């Protein structure tokens, strides 16, 4: 059973009851997932940007957007319009497929993994987690990478509070650390 199907059939009715909501449309849901990678060295090294674009496209299965500097900062040696990172926004089927792979395959492959921090919510029910290396994803092979780079993964939900967002992600299988 896919994560989307499990959400519709079991998670949604359970959250409706647990959060004591009156309408099925009030139940929080995942709206989008943003995978972002900032590359400080991309200003000097164009190959690192190309490698990052290829890796993120392989991991997410979607075209990558290059993020550019909004203004020049002399201290960082960047000019306006220079590429400084890349990002992917996932919605729909690809979003659910990525979330399922993240929860079931990627996170358990992290060394000394005890669960993700429950404190990484933003106050509006959205969750952000930082990944230190791209090797936790089974799509990336060790032989094809030139450097170990991390990424930020933001899960945007329709939840109004952090508690609603956490209960949604916990039902979906996100392994939260118990503090």
UniProtKB/Swiss-Prot annotation:
Regions annotated as coiled coil: none
Q: What InterPro entries does the entry give?
A: Ribosomal_uL5 (IPR002132), Ribosomal_uL5_bac-type (IPR020930), Ribosomal_uL5_C (IPR031309), Ribosomal_uL5_CS (IPR020929), Ribosomal_uL5_dom_sf (IPR022803), Ribosomal_uL5_N (IPR031310)
- Cite the entry's keywords alphabetically: Ribonucleoprotein, Ribosomal protein, RNA-binding, rRNA-binding, tRNA-binding
Q: Does the keyword tRNA-binding apply?
A: yes
Q: Which GO terms describe its cellular component?
A: ribonucleoprotein complex; ribosome
Q: Name one Pfam family in it.
A: Ribosomal_L5
Q: Name one GO molecular function term.
A: rRNA binding
Which GO terms fall under biological process for this protein? Answer: translation
Q: Where are the transmembrane segments?
A: none
Function text? This is one of the proteins that bind and probably mediate the attachment of the 5S RNA into the large ribosomal subunit, where it forms part of the central protuberance. In the 70S ribosome it contacts protein S13 of the 30S subunit (bridge B1b), connecting the 2 subunits; this bridge is implicated in subunit movement. Contacts the P site tRNA; the 5S rRNA and some of its associated proteins might help stabilize positioning of ribosome-bound tRNAs.
The subunit structure is:
Part of the 50S ribosomal subunit; part of the 5S rRNA/L5/L18/L25 subcomplex. Contacts the 5S rRNA and the P site tRNA. Forms a bridge to the 30S subunit in the 70S ribosome.
Q: Which NCBIfam families match?
A: PRK00010.1
Q: Which family does it belong to?
A: Belongs to the universal ribosomal protein uL5 family.
* Protein name, UniProt field: Large ribosomal subunit protein uL5
Q: Which organism encodes this protein?
A: Prochlorococcus marinus (strain MIT 9303)
């Amino acid at each position: 059973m896919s994560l989307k199907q499990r959400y519709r059939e079991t998670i949604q009715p359970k959250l409706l009851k647990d959060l004591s909501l009156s309408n099925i449309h009030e139940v929080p849901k995942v709206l989008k997932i943003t995978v972002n990678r900032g590359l400080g060295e991309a200003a000097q090294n164009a190959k690192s940007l190309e490698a990052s674009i290829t890796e993120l496209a392989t991991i997410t299965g979607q075209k990558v957007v290059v993020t550019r500097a909004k203004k020049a900062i002399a201290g960082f040696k960047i000019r306006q319009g220079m590429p400084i990172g890349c990002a992917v926004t996932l919605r729909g089927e690809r979003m659910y497929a990525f979330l399922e792979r993240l929860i079931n395959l990627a996170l358990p492959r992290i060394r000394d993994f005890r669960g993700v921090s429950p404190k990484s919510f933003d106050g509006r029910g959205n969750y952000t987690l930082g990944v230190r290396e791209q090797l936790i994803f089974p799509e990336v092979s060790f032989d094809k990478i030139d450097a170990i780079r991390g990424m930020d993964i933001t899960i945007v939900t329709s939840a109004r509070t952090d508690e609603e967002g956490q209960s949604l992600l916990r039902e979906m299988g996100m392994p939260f650390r118990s503090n």
